[in-house]
């Protein structure tokens, strides 16, 4: 028996003739894994084999059971049935500590970090306590430099953006020197250049024998990186393939049963400015924030303007200033439909026609313990009477409409927000704001964590909103997404905003260079300030 297996409880199924012993060479084997919840079967008879040194993709639409399956492997969720082998030895992993003892590390879609302590302290909690905090801090700095993941070990987690939190999770997993590494959407916060560098590292890890389970909705990444793929639909395995021999279209058919709709992005008819930001400069709210320096931005009716950039370069601070969470700006620095709004609270800005989708799903986008119907009330008040009474029937009907229109997999309008998968909650939050038919929509990471079919629908809805005369500002780290739906692009770096450039004239290489703040020399001819 492997030394790290000492003390682990063996599965009862190992004594059953129904499950023959797997090949001893396999790093991980799952057989007949089933997990039931009161309203749904998350996994049904799932079988999966991962070889040493293999980069194995797990594909599936939102709610297909991917995250539940990964949590079972990592010991966070107990299966109702099925067997698991690690390096040929049958095991039942009762908790993440036992998983880490087996050499299994995971980066979750929803992060497991304590807000009130520092990055280094969070990482230290999951490592061998024989290391001092100072040694862990040095290791974080070295690993961050090696992988191009900019992070300060001394920062409290509550000061980090969502993208920066994901970097912490990636570094924490890599510091455990895993033999099986589970990555859930690991590149959503990286520049194209950093993605390439991460892929070099992952291939090196695989060449050294580390197995990698890779969950991503970026089909081109899976085809470029992975050598095996298991597809889930409705909690069941529907296919196994070699993604290097598949096209994006064929992978989509395996995953959602059809090819995603093709967007037709025609030039829009722009109207009057609905958002104007003029010389916006704000000092950081805390020592770990980013100063905003001379931001000039304009979004007109009938256009989609995108802001690209690596997370942590001032996007959060800008979004707070635009949404009304930060009201320190002079009134005239932010104009909504011509009205000074820099000092207005979020509710007053909604009266002017602004709707906003934050990057944080739970906490800012939705209240975890409230139903989907009641979460509509965060930004919609038409079902509240003057006396404060709720029209519950109308509220539930409206929530049901969003659920149906955006194909949200949930137990109905009364389902609490925290019961949804990350992708399905994202669809509901984005759908809630789009269905309100705003004058101005500001959306951060509109398709973060959603499957290709849902992403295509959300992007189509954004373009339809634009064609109806809405002004849309999209902040995203998905360059493919920005190129697909935006009419103009900006890049944010170190608290400054680049000139805008017509999307048709932009390239991935140019935008990648601008992410480093190198736009002064390039901002000629094609680039222009939209102010």
How would you describe each model-predicted region?
Residues 5, 11-531:
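Glycine-rich phosphate-binding loops of nucleotide-dependent enzymes
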